[in-house]
Amino acid sequence: MGKRKRQQAVPRSPTGRELVILSILLKGKLYGREIQFAYERRMREELPAGSLYTTLDRMEDKGYVRSLRNERARDRYGPVRRYFRLTSAGKQTLKRYARWTALATASRRRRG
């Protein structure tokens, strides 16, 4: 038992929630509650912790993020936190979707 087996990163399209989380992680490494609060502020909707960690695990399986464990809260007696950071694949994915969105927006303007 123990660790979950990670699959080989397979290129798959990110979900809308994953794209929002990728953009949040552009700030640098963050732990789960920081990501949750930033998501809820940006999207103006609740993101339950279970849904957040399921999404983050899926993003790690896809190769978009990497988790770092064993970092303690500011005081050394705080809880061990699981931090997440973007990988180069996550950054590339975010750039690709930003370009696609810009092209789609420009195309709509020309038609409209």
Name what the model sees in each region.
Residues 27-31, 60-62, 89-91:
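Short, charged/polar surface micro-motifs in flexible loops or helix N-caps
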Residues 62-78:
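Beta-hairpin "wing" of winged helix-turn-helix
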Residues 80-82:
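Short beta-strand micro-motifs in enzyme catalytic cores
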Residues 3, 89-112:
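Amphipathic alpha-helical dimerization/coiled-coil segments
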Residues 52-54, 58-59:
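Basic amphipathic alpha-helical segments that dock to polyanions
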Residues 11-51:
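N-terminal helix-turn-helix DNA-binding core of bacterial DNA-binding proteins
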Residues 1-11:
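Short, Lys/Arg-enriched N-terminal segment that forms or immediately precedes the first helix
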